[in-house]
Amino acid sequence: MLKKFLISSIVKPTFQSRIIASTTLNGGAGRATFCSVNSINPNPTASQIKVDQEDLEVGEHLVIDDPNQQHIKSFLNGVEFNGKSVNIYRPSRNTMQTGTLRTKKWVIELPFNPKWNDRLMGWWASKDTLNQLNLRFNSETDAVAYCKEIGLNYNIVEEDVTLRKKKKYGHRFRYRGDLVGEKEREVGIN
């Protein structure tokens, strides 16, 4: 049995076509899968909300409360957001794979309630459904504009950039001359 429903408490009525959640119920066991859909306009928030360079800096950002959006910010899907902020980051590459497909989009991770442990079986669970939901955006600017429109405080996490240094193997194969009982010291090799 497949049911589709719209998460109306997470977005404003103008953006209800963006986030669709589908829940699949298999024999009493429920599995929820979420996806983001930008069907009307691929860049809906960038043209409406102005994002400055200060908004894109790494660190915590507080959005000024608007009386019209206070109810959206304080409650989201039945979860209280008092003082909590969302994380905006670019996911890192999986260490088991060499591909970078899932590292190109920016992700908004919503805060969730702590999990509890069932001591008998050792299961970890939570009644919070927001830990299953990640919103993906094409750019950091779109993600920040979305948070500013909804009125959520956000925290931009710094990107992990790996710099590859050129490896030098030539010092291993150079002629060292005749070594008679002396150890040669390799000098100036980085």
UniProtKB/Swiss-Prot annotation:
The entry's keywords: Electron transport, Membrane, Mitochondrion, Mitochondrion inner membrane, Respiratory chain, Transit peptide, Transport
Main localization, broad class: mitochondrion
Membrane topology designation: Peripheral membrane protein
A GO biological-process term: electron transport chain
Subcellular location: Mitochondrion inner membrane
CC per GO annotation: mitochondrial inner membrane; mitochondrion; respiratory chain complex I
Its biological purpose: Accessory subunit of the mitochondrial membrane respiratory chain NADH dehydrogenase (Complex I), that is believed not to be involved in catalysis. Complex I functions in the transfer of electrons from NADH to the respiratory chain. The immediate electron acceptor for the enzyme is believed to be ubiquinone.
Family in the record: Belongs to the complex I NDUFS4 subunit family.
Subunit-level organization: Complex I is composed of 45 different subunits. This is a component of the iron-sulfur (IP) fragment of the enzyme.
Name of the protein in its database record: NADH dehydrogenase [ubiquinone] iron-sulfur protein 4, mitochondrial
Source taxonomy: Eukaryota, Amoebozoa, Evosea, Eumycetozoa, Dictyostelia
